[in-house]
Amino acid sequence: MKIGTRMPPFALEVGFEKYANWLAENGFEAVDTPPLTADIGRICATHGLEIGSCDATDLGILSKDAAVRRKALSQFKKDISAIKRFGGHTCFVVIGPDDPSQSRQTSVEIFSKIYPKVVEHAEREGIQIAIEPYPGPAPYYPNLGCTPESLRRIFEIVPSANLGICYDPSHFARIQIDYLRLLHEFGDRVRHVHLKDTE
């Protein structure tokens, strides 16, 4: 296991190269990145940083609009292939609708149609997908993958070992989910870990 960070606001201000240099100088060994590019991969290698997880471009993969979903799926596959090409191994995703009032039932129905295609591509590329359990904004908390019930349904639809979770206890605590019990149930699905203070 290597300790790294997600990109804080100051990293966007100074640029990825200076941020990577700061990480290396301060003893960090890894970094989570935006959608991976050749330049970001080169910078990580130059500074001896392992690529932790790489964000996918969010273009509305759970949209009710089929045209939006097709575009999102195409970009998602490109992001996964770029992770493989430029030295990454894990794709970080938030599975949420572009309309926060969209029902979970609708989101699950859309997920069941489109995510098997995403994961099939990840399997071909040898890339892991880690679902961030961020529940989304109140009052809807519309995102999938933030409760045990939702995770069970997700893995029932897509049982592939290439689909797992980014274990972040803070998000579970926020909506009063027992994060230790959840870890016991889904420990074999953990592909990445985030830690932060929470109450």
Question: Positions of the model-derived regions?
Answer:
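Histidine-centered active-site/metal-ligand motif
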Residues: 160, 171, 192-194
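Short acidic active-site motifs
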Residues: 39-40, 178-182
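Aromatic-lined glycan-binding groove of carbohydrate-active enzymes
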Residues: 180-199
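Active-site beta-loop-alpha junctions enriched in small/polar residues
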Residues: 6-10, 34-36, 56-59, 96-98, ...
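A short, acidic/glycine-rich surface segment
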Residues: 15, 174-177
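Active-site acidic/histidine proton-transfer and metal-coordination neighborhood
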Residues: 66-165, 174-175, 185
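N-terminal pre-domain/capping segments
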Residues: 1-89, 112, 116, 123, ...
